Structures are given as C-alpha cells and as structure tokens.
C-alpha cells in the first residue's frame, strides 16, 4: 500500500501523542518524610522551698466583754464607739451616790470600833473587862475595817474601766439604763487587734505526710523560717507583714478530719479585722534535688495518670508515667518518673508519638527550668 504525504505526517504525530499519554499514567516517587521538630526543656535538679496555702479566718488576739460589777444607773458613756481605748480607761460612770454614802458610813463605823478596841485593850490589862469582851471588840474592829474596804471597792466599781487595750465596739447601753452586777449581756466588747490571730485548718492526712517526709529526710526544715507564715487577703492582695506559727491543735476534728493551726500576725494599722477570710501560706520545708517539670509538658492519660514525653539519647520519643506531687508556680514538682538531664517535650506534642525520631530545639513557650517560681501551692493541687 502506498502512503500518501498526509499519512506520512499523521503517523508520527499519533505515536508522539500515544507516548505522551502513556507517560501521564506514571506517578512520581513521594519525597522522604521530614523529621518532626519539637521544643524541649532540659530538667535540672534544684533546691525548692515548699509552701502550703490553706484557707482561714482572722480572730482577735484578746477579747474582753465589759460588764458592771455593781448595780446602778448609767450616768455617762465616756468613749466613742469604734475607737481605740487603753487598758484602765474609764468607759462608763454609774451613779455613785449610794456607794459614796455606804463608804462614809463604813468609815464612821470603823472609827467607832477602832476606838472601842483600843479602850478594851487597856481595860483588859487592869482586868476591868474580860478577855472575851476584848476579843469581841477587836473582831468588830476588823470587820469594820473589811467593810470599809468593800465599800471602797464598790465605789471604785462605779467607774467602769476597760480591762484591755484595743478597739471597742458599739455600746449596748445608754445613759439612764439600769445595769446589774452579773448581768448576762455585756455593756460593750473590747478586742485587741494588734497582733491578730489567723486560724487555718489543714487535713490530717497532709500533716501526716509532712511529718513522714521530714522524718525520712525527703524534706529539710527551713531553719529560722520554719515557723514563718505569709498571708493573702480576700481580694487577692498580699499582706505586707509576715507572721509566725503559734501552735497546732492537739486533736483532729472528727467531723472534718482536719487540724486547726494558729498563726499570729502584727497588725499595727488594723488592716486585718476579726472574721476576715484569708489564705495563709505556710512554709513546710526545703526539698533538695527537686525536679520541676513545665506544666505544658505534663498531660494525663485515660487512667488519670500524669505522663510526659521525653527525648532519649537516640533522639527518639519516650512516654514516661510520672508522679506529680504539687504545682509550684507554673511547674509540677515531680517525685517519680523524671530525672535531672531529661529532655521533656513542651512544644509539638501533637505531632509526635512514642518511638518517633525527632529534631529538638529549645522551647519558647516556657521559662528556663532554672528559674522556677517557688510560689505557694494549694493543698488541692497535688497530682
């Protein structure tokens, strides 16, 4: 068959088109997978001061209820409600008229019995009176002397004085009111606010754990600062003055399972008032060679266990189950599962899994592990 010029042009073109179509069916080889990059923090052992934050209430250092010790009508109130008073300062004046008369009568009776006792003393020497008569006269004199002292005390009690220095509250009585010795209601109450008590409660389990750690050497006592306490107010501000631990209760409350701890704080400006809700920060002790792990690198699995991903010497990811004791600042205090020198992953966690080889760079989302903020940890922040 003889090819025409048109066929000679068409055949090579078809061959080229078929070759091109067959080339389109072949897929290119995928590029090699890139090694994921993660941000890590290298852990270092450090000395950490452990604090516990506990809720509490303020209480007056001393409380004295002012009550009358004699009966009578109130003539004057001599203080301003809500003011500061001194011990021995007069607060009320009870009508003294009756007690002044009793005192004068007792003095007159004393003079009479004293004169008679002295006369009988001379007469008994001459046997003009019996020894019994002299003894009776001397006893009457002594009774009169005691009556004068009692009348003087009652007269003094018409001036109602403050038993302690402190701030006095509102007055429960006014001028013209009748008050009686031994009445149930106080006339006023004086509270000493400087210093002031702070009573906090700590679970007995936490107290037992603290004692065990101190006994085993896991914790060291914080020396001169062992009994120091700081205070956070209800609005979140820090109280500027430091207090000291006074005592802990000798028994555990059966209803709450807690122990009461009392601290005392200086309060020169009366900034703290009785009944305020506060948070006391108690220094437990010092932990040597503590491991602090950034919170960004600690997660929990389905069982609720704290876990962390670390990069081993072969640059591969390892899963560690750890024991996170408490939060200190923005880090977890880890007591098991991590060691000094471990490289904990804090960035890129979502791109890796155990066994994967990774490329490490210093993390940017956390501060240096060497600059741990040893802020107080609440007792409920343990993991």
UniProtKB/Swiss-Prot annotation:
Induction: By growth under severe iron limitation.
Effect of residue 62 to D: Abolishes complex formation and thereby decreases drug resistance
Presence of the UniProt keyword Membrane in the record: yes
Phenotype of the disrupted gene, per the record: Disruption of MexA, MexB and OprM significantly reduces active efflux of N-(3-oxododecanoyl) homoserine lactone/3-oxo-C12-HSL/PAI-1, but not N-butyryl homoserine lactone/C4-HSL/PAI-2.
Result when mutating residue 123 to D: Abolishes complex formation and thereby abolishes drug resistance
Coiled-coil residue spans: 97-151
Keywords, sorted A to Z: Antibiotic resistance, Cell inner membrane, Cell membrane, Coiled coil, Lipoprotein, Membrane, Palmitate, Signal, Transport
InterPro entries: CusB-like_dom_1 (IPR043602), CusB_D23 (IPR032317), MFP_Efflux (IPR051160), RND_pump_MFP (IPR006143)
Protein name: Multidrug resistance protein MexA
């Amino acid at each position: 068959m003889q090819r025409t010029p048109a066929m000679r042009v068409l055949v090579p073109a078809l061959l080229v088109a078929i070759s091109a179509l067959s080339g389109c069916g072949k897929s290119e080889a995928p590029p090699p997978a890139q090694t994921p990059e993660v941000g890590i923090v290298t852990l270092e052992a450090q000395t950490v001061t452990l604090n516990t934050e506990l809720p509490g209430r303020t209480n007056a250092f001393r409380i004295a209820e002012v009550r009358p010790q004699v009966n009578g009508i109130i003539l004057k109130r001599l203080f301003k409600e809500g003011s500061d008073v001194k011990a021995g300062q007069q607060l009320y004046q009870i009508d003294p008229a009756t007690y002044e008369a009793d005192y004068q009568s007792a003095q007159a009776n004393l003079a009479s019995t004293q004169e008679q006792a002295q006369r009988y003393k001379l007469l008994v020497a001459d046997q003009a009176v019996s020894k019994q008569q002299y003894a009776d006269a001397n006893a009457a004199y002594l009774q009169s002397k005691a009556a004068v002292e009692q009348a003087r005390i009652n007269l003094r009690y018409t001036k109602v004085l403050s038993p302690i220095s402190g701030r006095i509250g509102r007055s429960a009585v006014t001028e013209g009111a009748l008050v009686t010795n031994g009445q149930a209601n106080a006339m006023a109450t004086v509270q000493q606010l400087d210093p002031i008590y702070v009573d906090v409660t700590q679970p007995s389990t936490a107290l037992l754990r603290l004692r065990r750690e101190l006994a085993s050497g896991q914790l060291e006592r914080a020396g001169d600062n062992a009994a120091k306490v700081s205070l956070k107010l209800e609005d979140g501000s820090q109280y500027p003055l430091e207090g000291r631990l006074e005592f802990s209760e000798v028994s555990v409350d059966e209803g709450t399972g807690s122990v009461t701890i009392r601290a005392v704080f200086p309060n020169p400006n009366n900034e703290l008032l009785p009944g305020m809700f506060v948070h006391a920060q108690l220094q437990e002790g010092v932990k040597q060679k503590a491991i602090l792990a950034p919170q960004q690198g600690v997660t929990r699995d389905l069982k609720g266990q704290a876990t962390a991903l670390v990069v081993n010497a072969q640059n591969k990811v390892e899963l560690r189950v750890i024991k996170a004791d408490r939060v200190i600042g923005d880090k977890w205090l880890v007591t098991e599962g991590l060691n000094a020198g471990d490289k904990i992953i804090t960035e890129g966690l979502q791109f890796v899994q155990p066994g994967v080889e990774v490329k490490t760079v210093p993390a940017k989302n956390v501060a240096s592990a060497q600059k741990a903020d040893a802020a107080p940890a609440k007792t409920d922040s343990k993991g």
